[in-house]
């Protein structure tokens, strides 16, 4: 197979949703169809000892939530699929945001009983901003939920995107009979013992079946006819432009509607996209020379070996193990001899990969999130990845002073992952951590204890707002007040931590010569 054919066979997507909509369960079932796993662990069944493949970290298995992005790869038909299962919890939205920089499409999972929820809306807006095509899977049809038309209206009105139902449910909850496939004009029954039923051109079953006597069936057929006659036409160009979302109904937990979704996804999802450089030029995936960028760093995927993996999205050309590449930030060449593919925490050596693939590079501290790696004599760097402004701040120290070495190593590695942000006071060197949400602190504390054997003491600093300084040379010590703390971030940039909005405005009025700015 040529490099061009290999690249065109890649499908790389993220799954986004509000917590508990069924995102991780859908991921598991897709892996089952890809033959990547034999048995799906369910999120709810924590007592059974089975855990979701994508929830590989100990804290995830204990809590039944995803707090880090996982990468899973499998082959399906003639396609090579990369799934990025993102943190569902809003406190980890920064990790999710960066993950969305590395995909070509997204699957939005919606709980049929709850519709569009806050985290779904937030992540959808990121996809929309980036022009990422979105596929929608409306989940849990075997439970009572909102009516299908109500859900479609909610998607269209809340998200300002057109919908095209690829299938249509016959009932829901206890009366859930199955789904009508629009393209095949078949009804797939929910019960295993039933076989496919076929509709003729007049929307009638081609064979006798007791379901025709049920009002649920006649209502579903009426709705389906209305969708066929008055709904949107399917337009693949609109899908690729992020203006239309194909909608699939099903139940991930019951493994129903998942394979038909996967079949449609590989038919319609885009092949790998290029990426824009800082020089505002696009690098095509078919550019012969290799290029890629680091979008995530994960420490301790194997706690026994204290390893660190840098996740790289290949943007162009082909990667070969042992090749020489240049890290643009340092302008230094390096030979990549240790590279890996993923099934959550299971790893396998990668000798060859192409544009669209996600691979892991063993990291001894060389890489940072957002780094560009290139082959040949290429000189560009890709655009920086976003960083969020934290809203919560805690002082942190080791409970046992004899554990300082492990304490500092743990902080260094977890900060480099981008899971938490690091600050240090200028004169006392007190470490302050910043987070978007409280759960980040809880996970940090848990991982320090379990992965680095360090108990930490955390104490709020009473500050809620971080503002970076453009003109650092104009700062004077007296500008730190009882309502603000002057600190440095991990890149030694000056940052003021303010008590509240009032304190921020007071500072800006008192010191107009100091130019402050925030991140995302």
UniProtKB/Swiss-Prot annotation:
One of its GO terms (molecular function) is GTP binding. Gene3D superfamilies: P-loop containing nucleotide triphosphate hydrolases, Peptide chain release factor 3, domain III, Translation factors. Coiled coil: none annotated. Keywords: Cytoplasm, GTP-binding, Nucleotide-binding, Protein biosynthesis. Signal peptide: none annotated. Pfam families: EF-G_D2, GTP_EFTU, RF3_C. Disulfide bonds: none annotated. Its main location: cytoplasm. GTP binds at residues 17-24, 85-89, 139-142. The keyword GTP-binding applies. Residues 8-273 form the tr-type G domain. GO terms for biological process: regulation of translational termination. The keyword Calcium does not apply. It is found in: Cytoplasm. One of its GO terms (cellular component) is cytosol. PANTHER family: PEPTIDE CHAIN RELEASE FACTOR RF3 (PTHR43556:SF2). Increases the formation of ribosomal termination complexes and stimulates activities of RF-1 and RF-2. It binds guanine nucleotides and has strong preference for UGA stop codons. It may interact directly with the ribosome. The stimulation of RF-1 and RF-2 is significantly reduced by GTP and GDP, but not by GMP. Belongs to the TRAFAC class translation factor GTPase superfamily. Classic translation factor GTPase family. PrfC subfamily. HAMAP family: Rel_fac_3. This is Peptide chain release factor 3. It comes from Staphylococcus carnosus (strain TM300).
């Amino acid at each position: 197979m040529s490099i061009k054919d290999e690249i065109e066979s890649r499908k790389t997507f993220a799954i986004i949703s509000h917590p508990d909509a069924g995102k991780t369960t859908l991921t598991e079932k897709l892996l089952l169809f890809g033959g990547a796993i034999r048995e799906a662990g369910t999120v709810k069944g924590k007592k059974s000892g089975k855990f979701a493949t994508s929830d590989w970290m100990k804290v995830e298995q204990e809590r039944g939530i995803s707090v880090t992005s996982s990468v899973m790869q499998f082959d399906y038909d003639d396609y090579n699929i990369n799934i990025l299962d993102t943190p569902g919890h809003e406190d980890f939205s920064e990790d999710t945001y960066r993950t969305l920089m590395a995909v070509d499409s997204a699957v939005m999972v919606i709980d049929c009983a709850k519709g569009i929820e806050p985290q779904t809306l937030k992540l959808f807006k990121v996809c929309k901003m980036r022009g990422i095509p979105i596929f929608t899977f409306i989940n849990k049809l075997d439970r009572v939920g909102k009516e299908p038309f109500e859900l479609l209206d909610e998607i269209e009105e809340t998200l300002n995107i057109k919908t095209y139902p690829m299938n249509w449910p016959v009932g829901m909850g206890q009366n859930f009979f199955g789904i009508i496939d629009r393209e095949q004009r078949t009804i797939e029954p929910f019960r295993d013992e039933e076989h496919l039923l076929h509709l003729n051109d007049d929307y009638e079953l081609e064979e006798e079946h007791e379901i025709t006597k049920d009002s649920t069936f006649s209502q579903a057929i009426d709705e389906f006819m209305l969708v066929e006659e008055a709904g949107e036409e399917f337009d693949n160009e609109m899908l690729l432009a992020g203006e239309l979302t194909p909608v699939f109904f099903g139940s991930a937990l019951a493994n129903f509607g998942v394979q038909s979704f996967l079949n449609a996804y590989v038919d319609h999802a885009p092949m790998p996209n290029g990426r824009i450089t800082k020089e505002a030029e696009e690098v095509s995936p078919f550019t012969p020379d290799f290029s890629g960028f680091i979008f995530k760093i994960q420490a301790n995927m194997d706690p026994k070996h204290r390893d660190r993996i840098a996740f790289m999205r290949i943007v162009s050309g082909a990667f070969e193990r042992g090749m020489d590449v240049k890290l643009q930030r340092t302008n230094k060449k390096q030979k990549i001899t240790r590279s890996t593919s993923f099934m959550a925490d299971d790893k396998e050596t990668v000798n060859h990969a192409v544009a669209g693939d996600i691979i892991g590079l063993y990291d001894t501290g060389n890489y940072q999130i957002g780094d560009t790696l290139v082959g040949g004599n290429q000189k560009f760097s890709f655009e920086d990845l976003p960083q969020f402004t934290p809203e919560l701040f805690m002082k942190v120290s080791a409970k046992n002073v004899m554990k300082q070495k492990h304490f500092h190593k743990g902080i260094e590695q977890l900060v480099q992952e981008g899971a938490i942000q690091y600050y240090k006071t200028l004169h006392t060197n007190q470490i302050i951590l910043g987070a978007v949400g409280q759960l980040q602190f809880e996970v940090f504390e848990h991982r320090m204890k379990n992965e680095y054997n360090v108990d930490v003491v955390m104490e709020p600093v009473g500050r809620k707002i971080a503002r970076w300084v453009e003109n650092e040379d104009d700062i004077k010590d007296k500008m730190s007040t009882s309502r603000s703390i002057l600190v440095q971030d991990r890149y030694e940039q000056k940052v003021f931590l303010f008590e509240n909005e009032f304190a921020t405005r007071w500072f800006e009025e008192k010191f107009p010569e100091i130019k402050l700015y925030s991140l995302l």
